[in-house]
Amino acid sequence: MSEKTKKTKRLDDLNFFDFDAIKLGIASPEQIMAWSHGEVKKPETINYRTLKPERDGLFCERIFGPTKDYECSCGKYRWVKYKGMQCDRCGVEITEAKVRRERMGHLELAVPVAHVWFLRKNPSRIGIMLDMRITDLERVVYYASYVVVEDCIDSVTGRTDYKKGELLTDVQVREARKKHGSRLKVDIGAPAVKKLLSDIDFDKEIPTLHVQLAETQSELERTKLIRRIKTMEEFKASGNRPEWMILSVLPVIPPDLRPLVPLDGGRFAASDLNDLYRRIINRNNRLKHIESLRAPEVMIYNEKRLLQEAVDALIENGARGKFFIGAGGRPLKSLSDVIKGKHGRFRQNLLGKRVDYSGRSVIVVGPSLKLHQCGLPKLMALELFKPFIIGELMKKEGVTLKAAKKMLERVRPEIWDILEQVTKNHPVMLNRAPTLHRLGIQAFEPVLIEGKAIQLHPLTCAAFNADFDGDQMAVHVPLSLEAQLEARTLMLATNNILSPASGRPIAAPSHDIVMGISFLTKVKLNDFGEGAVFGSMEEALMAYAYGKVSLHARIKVRGITAIKEDGMNEKDLKNVNTWKDYTTVGKIIFNNNLPEGWPYVNGAVGKKELAAIIDECYKSKKYGKYETVQLLDRIMKLGYNYATRSGLSISIADMIVPAAKQKYIDAAKKRIKEIQGQAEAGIITEGERYNKVIDIWTRVTDDVAVEQFKEMKKFEEAPYSGEGQRFNSVFLMADSGARGSRQQVRQLAGMRGLMAKPQKKLTGGQGEIIESPITSNFREGLSVLEYFISTHGGRKGLSDTALKTAEAGYLTRRLIDVAHNLVVMEEDCGTTNGVVVSSLMSGEEVVEPIEERILGRTSLEDVIVKIKKADGKEEEKTIIKEGDSITLEQSKLVKKYGVQNLRIRSVLTCESKNGVCGKCYGVSLVSGNISNVGDSVGIIAAQSIGEPGTQLTLRTFHIGGAASRMLSQSQAVAELGGKVTFKDIKVITNRFDNKICISRNGAIFVEAANGTIKEYKIQYGATLHIADKVTVEKGTLMAEWDPHSIPVLSETEGTARLTDVSEGITLQEERNKVTGVIERKITASRMGKKNPRIVIEGKGGKKVSLPLPVDTILLVENGEDVLAGDILAKIAKASGGTKDITSGLPRIAELFEARKPRNAAIMSEFAGVVSLETSPKGLVEIVVRSEETGQVKQYAVPQGKHLVVYEGDHVGVGEALTDGAIDPHDVLRVKGIKEVQEFLLNAIQEVYRLQGVTINDRHIEVIVRQMLGNVKIVDAGDTPLLKGEIVSRATLLKHNAQAEKEGKKIAVGDPILLGISKASLASDSFISAASFQETTKVLTDAAITGQVDTLQGLKENVIVGHLIPAGTGISAREFTKEFEAAKKK
């Protein structure tokens, strides 16, 4: 027996699962012949009568193997006993039919043809090798021009008349032949290219090219030479030969990979590849035939060209713009099309497979389930657990397989007991599409239920983003024991309480539950039973049960509240309204459901408070996960119970319209009339008028909303009359966070507010706001005009949703691709580098305090604070030690002692060779423990960033396009009293005796008595109301300015002369439609370079030049006398449009793709003083002169750019000199890697924060690390790298280590910022890159360089079918390695 099994195991069978790397190369003709099992000579496929494959055709059994297992074509041999024999009649080997999936054939081409990938794919590899233009190459390959294949030297003069590689037309060849005869060697078509390629000798060529590279001066020539050298060295190193890029033998892929599928009605559905192969065989055979007939050259060339085109079409149809069309007029799918794109091999079959043992059904709510359970319909479970049931039946009943299947089909009663038993401890996985993050698939224990719908626990809805309006979910059964174990320990719903994106609870109560709890814990004055004093909780609950006291009545209970408060007499005890410390029965009921020993919660409990309780419970050492799960289930039951009892319903009377609404609107209209008057008088410009109007309405809308909530709250705080409702339902829902936002309630009963206009804005932004708001609300009803205005907003929301979901999905895909191979690879990399974090500020307010940013991160230093002891002495105390993972308690101490900043470890500075280390990543956000080796932090980061993208795009339409604008700040008011200090403020007095600030980066510092200092930035042109070194009270107005425009001020007395300002060229006069005033605006000159400016000619002949950017509104006439502080012109600021995530999502994509902004700001490369000059071309030039080094740099300012610095200003390193977006590449170049990391992190977080989405910093850090993972070689040293090449940091380190070992000069690289798409394609793994984008290009490159994919990342392992190197897959790998090592010993 053992002998026999050994024989059947064929030695040439590879084990397809046991390999560590994949290498790609170019197949040589010998290699193709070695793969082949025979030549395909005929274009026939199968015989239409017998339906058997034709001999020597595309499905021939002799070449590719038998169509039926162990049966030859003619039927002489059939059965396994003849295995391995070859039939003497039909020549078919007796073997399994599945060899038809792996055996290849070949086609001898009558003439070599060029491989279209190497010829056409940019950059053309054949072109680089021969140093020929792609157009010239095509002329040769497609038989339009001849090429000289050897230098032709004139025998008389010794001159080279025709150089190798030169192109000649038909006529030129005839002429040259007359002169040179047979000395002229020319050829045409792919054979000519093949000859040229085979003549290349790398050992001679490469040194020659290096010499040329050293000598050349031209940058273009350099780039070209570097590319040639690189390609040649790649060829040499990989062992490929250049002539293999020309095919003389064509492989024919196995027939089962291009099948003919019989359809009913005797027709066949054929794979397109068969058509393409047929066309090649036909043309090849015809060419052979014509050649044997000695046909004229023209005919033969034409036929050869057709063969070349046919092979092109097989490899990549449409590569040259011409498609081969199949039946039905669609282009045929070539080999390239089969592998690329969403429906190609990579993405359709290798990365996304269909799964057996799965089902799907509609979901319904299962409020009686525990958190770890789901309701599974019995019929579904019966089908899903079939194999397990059959196994049990065979074991229990002792029946055969067949009988067990019969029993199952008839659904015998004993089967239900077995099903119960089989599903008892067998978790199933539920998944809801789209699976945007890891919580989209969770494991549950099934509870068998009647009916056909799956029951889902309400608290998991947030993670799945599920609701019960007809959503469907899929069920998957983990089969193996390991899979079950992983599902239970890693994926069970009880392990997924925290969101991996923010580390906050995601399984927190919402909607009805919050409503119920909020109702339960509310207080109502004058409710029955008020003023009762109870001896214990139980007594109070009993009184409630007997109906003696209401749920919301104010009561006192011994042990919870103070019975006698300080300074209270007996009379006060009877008067409830004097009580300060009281509780309600509802609050007692709520607190009884909290974990034992939890401090009594006596406030109102809404959504936020509940989430905080869950968070604290989960993260505290005392309670932990198990207790939190119990708590969640108790809160859910309680919430549903009291939501039902509350009898909540909304009536139109609940929507209270604030009484003061009309007063606000009238005041606003009056104010707008005044502004209109100012505009008509020409005091303010049209742009300013518009901005002011919008500002007024935005304020009014907010005021009305505030007023409305006040009135609703009043109703709640009013004493209960004994009948009717106790609370306002609308307010209860919005206030507790159960449903609806302030904005929605405002639209119901306040005023709808401003709406966005459909068309694009003149300034290029979108969402211009209509300046007359909708003053009605939905309760009063909208007028026809108002309704019409709002329709646009509503529709925009819906269409945005559809378009943007795809956009967000694509962003997630790119993020996953760039970060998938980042896994925690070691516990500690031992680095001493890190980043400094402090509280994030936006202007004056703290956006994210330091204690939130450091939570769960590893500290790089001891944090020592000074504490005052009771005796007044100070002592030092260490609150955080170096290397600590900062806990919740420690972060609270940081807040308490006011620590300003802290150095922490970060993924950005982690020094792990591949992947990151646990210490740098910090505590896992999901578990709250330090990250384990194998955590796939890259994927989690990508999901956390991508998932809200989709959510946000889906959220715009709820508000119906109501314009939300940020109110512009226009004054500096002292927030605390203290002493004033001016910094960098130059002041002049204008003709009205006002003090005007004329410095660009001035600031006022106010120092309070306790030493706190507050900084206020003062704008250029601001009016100052205080002097330097005075003391101000809190709330003093210190300065104010116009928020909508920047003035151009005269700083001295003199005469204004307008230079380069000429009507119709750089000045445009237009009459304002609304006000009828004529405005004079500076425009970009179409004719020549003009540089509009005002020159002030002062006393003593001193001249000051003030540049006027485009869109400046001119307020002075030429030759007018001006005084210091006069406003000569105004530059309008573009006002913010509506802040939609629509602008947010493209912004995030722009940052991650590291795109250069359209109008980037010019940055100063060093610190210095600014002076303004005019370049020879007439443009403004900013000159920065360093005071320390004397270094000078000029920056030309393009037309239409606004300056933000002026003559004599001081600028710092990397400070913007003009307006415009900041280009991250500039930040990297000027300020370095740390700054660009911080810039990207803050810019991305800002977009999400605007939408109220919390994402932990480290997810963005992970992606930014990947974006900065490559370097550009500046000096190659003695390494094989080339100057200007972009390689990963790991590659550079590897080459440098090798060079150091050999005592050679190492290479130097500059860090470079790549966008996520580019970074994905620059991945070291070609399998991962090919499955992302540009598949054919990636594969072409990989084949030429003979690239080896060592299968380090997740994606490539999924594709080749290995366990992924993350999580349990890593431990499996380690174990296998150790096992192999032990075996060797």
Swiss-Prot record:
Which SMART domains does the UniProt record give? RPOLA_N (SM00663)
What catalytic reaction does the record list? RNA(n) + a ribonucleoside 5'-triphosphate = RNA(n+1) + diphosphate
According to the record, cofactor stoichiometry and binding are noted as: Binds 1 Mg(2+) ion per subunit. Binds 2 Zn(2+) ions per subunit.
Cellular component GO terms, alphabetical: DNA-directed RNA polymerase complex
Residues reported to bind Mg(2+): 467, 469, 471
**Cofactor or coenzyme needed:** Mg(2+); Zn(2+)
Q: Does the keyword Nucleotide-binding apply?
A: no
Positions contributing to Zn(2+) 1 binding = 72, 74, 87, 90
Report the SUPFAM superfamilies cross-referenced here.
beta and beta-prime subunits of DNA dependent RNA-polymerase (SSF64484)
Q: EC top class, in one word? A: transferase
Q: How does it assemble?
A: The RNAP catalytic core consists of 2 alpha, 1 beta, 1 beta' and 1 omega subunit. When a sigma factor is associated with the core the holoenzyme is formed, which can initiate transcription.
Q: What does this protein do?
A: DNA-dependent RNA polymerase catalyzes the transcription of DNA into RNA using the four ribonucleoside triphosphates as substrates.
Kindly provide the name given to this protein in its UniProt entry: DNA-directed RNA polymerase subunit beta'
| Organism name | Elusimicrobium minutum (strain Pei191)
- Protein encoded by which gene: rpoC
